[in-house]
């Protein structure tokens, strides 16, 4: 069953410490700060940003992708000052009523439970309000922290996909994880 994921307005979400909201051009410097850190882009398919224009372009793509119903990308902002410290979101697969999840967080906020909190909120949204059947995540094999995060959220490894990704001039083996609606509600 196919589901229409084109929707408006943008669904803002709230957690104990975070606002999950649409990024705007006012967030350009914050987005640049995240993606100009080589520690953040090490496992990412984007090159490390060197110009503010790259952040402007990413925000524009996030907005366009939401407007055409293909993807949704939430900016992760601290409640205390609404400052954007990362992002997370889904790329919809309407054919199977599912999504692929992606995420990144400014390195100074790693290992504080922030991404776990943000992903839990968007998974609740995806499974509860959008009726998704499952979510897929694909990570580089060396990304131990991401593997730990996914396992904590209940994702199960489905194995390694050889040369699944190609970026930064080379092929990458990726480990694929899957979380079904029933597995998420059981966690």
Where are these regions (language model features)?
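Acyl-donor (CoA/ACP) binding surface of acyl/acetyltransferases
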Residues: 1-41, 73, 77-187
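Hydrophobic residues in alpha-helical segments
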Residues: 35, 44, 66-67
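Conserved GNAT-fold acetyl-CoA-binding loop/helix
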Residues: 39-61, 72-74
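A short hydrophobic/aromatic micro-motif that marks alpha-helical segments and, especially, helix-coil
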Residues: 51-53, 66, 184
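A generic secondary-structure signal
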Residues: 61-65, 125
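Short loop/turn motifs at secondary-structure junctions and domain boundaries
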Residues: 64-70, 155
């Amino acid at each position: 069953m196919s589901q229409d994921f084109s929707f408006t307005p943008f669904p803002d979400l709230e957690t104990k410490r975070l606002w999950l909201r649409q990024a705007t051009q006012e967030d350009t410097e914050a987005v640049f700060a995240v993606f100009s850190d080589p520690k953040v882009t090490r496992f990412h398919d984007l090159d490390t940003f060197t110009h503010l224009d790259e952040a402007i372009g990413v925000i524009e793509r996030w907005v366009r992708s939401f407007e055409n119903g293909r993807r949704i990308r939430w900016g992760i902002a601290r409640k205390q000052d609404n400052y954007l410290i990362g992002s997370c979101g889904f790329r919809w697969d309407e054919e199977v009523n599912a999504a692929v999840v992606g995420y990144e967080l400014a390195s100074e906020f790693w290992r504080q439970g922030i991404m776990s909190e943000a992903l839990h909120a968007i998974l609740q949204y995806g499974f509860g309000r959008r009726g998704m059947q499952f979510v897929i995540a694909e990570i580089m094999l060396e990304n131990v922290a991401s593997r730990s995060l996914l396992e904590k959220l209940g994702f199960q490894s489905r194995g390694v996909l050889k040369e699944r990704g190609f970026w930064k001039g080379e092929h990458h083996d990726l480990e694929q994880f899957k979380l079904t609606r029933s597995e998420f509600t059981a966690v």
